[in-house]
């Protein structure tokens, strides 16, 4: 594999890394790119990607979604059988589809957990993180927490002892609120966590809290040498 500048693939949902007569690494975002308006991979798109895999190229799915929200598409595209990588949570976690190995990840410091919880409780926000195939909610789920679980195809567990329960590795948390309030809360959380995490809105009602420095493009830069691509 040789890494060249990113160029548009003939298949518009992909970026390609490589050159003529070399194996390529193709990177596809999920929402708004790989999926259609029904949040599905169309048959045409699926066949195109399977064709790419059969030619011996590698496919990487990159998304802001948590890892469990990407698993369905991994299976649909046979990446677990034919090889590929998932770049989840805006680049905070990378998994080898064939082995299930976590090849790279960045973690939130657990010191943010009680701070986010206290803030969300005070403001009446929703608050979740992820463990395995579950959304771990600090409070009874609001409509946005429910929506997030639905689009990712995962179940919700409510833990009233959330600050104590969340003592495992986490790649991101999501705070939910009405859009007009989320705009205000985003700025407040940025100030609260400025030394510990990056805070941004991925949707008008979703405020994401991720490790400092997390970026999908930077994660891809780190991943390519690990999978045999040359700079």
What are these regions (language model features)?
Residues 24-38:
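Asp-based phosphoryl-transfer active-site loop
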Residues 43-144:
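Active-site phosphate-binding/coordination module
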Residues 119, 123-231:
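Conserved acidic, metal-coordinating active-site core of Asp-based
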């Amino acid at each position: 594999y040789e890494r060249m500048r990113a160029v548009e693939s003939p298949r518009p949902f992909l970026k390609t890394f490589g050159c003529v007569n070399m194996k390529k690494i193709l990177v596809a975002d999920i929402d708004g790119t790989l999926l259609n308006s029904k949040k599905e991979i169309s048959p045409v798109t699926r066949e195109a990607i399977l064709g790419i895999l059969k030619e011996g190229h590698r496919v990487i799915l990159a998304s802001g979604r948590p890892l469990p929200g990407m698993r369905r598409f991994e299976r649909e595209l046979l990446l677990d059988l034919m090889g590929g990588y998932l770049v989840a949570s805006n680049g905070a976690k990378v998994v080898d589809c064939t082995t299930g190995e976590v090849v790279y990840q960045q973690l939130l410091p657990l010191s943010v957990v009680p701070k986010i919880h206290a803030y969300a409780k005070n403001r009446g926000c929703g608050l979740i993180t992820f463990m395995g195939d579950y959304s771990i909610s600090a409070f009874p789920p609001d409509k946005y927490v429910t929506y997030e679980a639905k689009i990712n195809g995962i179940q919700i567990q409510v833990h009233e002892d959330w600050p104590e329960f969340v003592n495992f590795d986490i790649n991101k948390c999501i705070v939910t609120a009405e859009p007009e309030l989320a705009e205000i809360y985003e700025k407040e959380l940025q100030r609260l966590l400025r030394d510990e995490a990056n805070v941004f809105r991925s949707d008008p009602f979703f405020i994401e809290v991720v490790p400092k420095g997390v970026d999908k493009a930077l994660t891809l830069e780190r991943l390519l040498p690990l999978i045999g691509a040359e700079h």
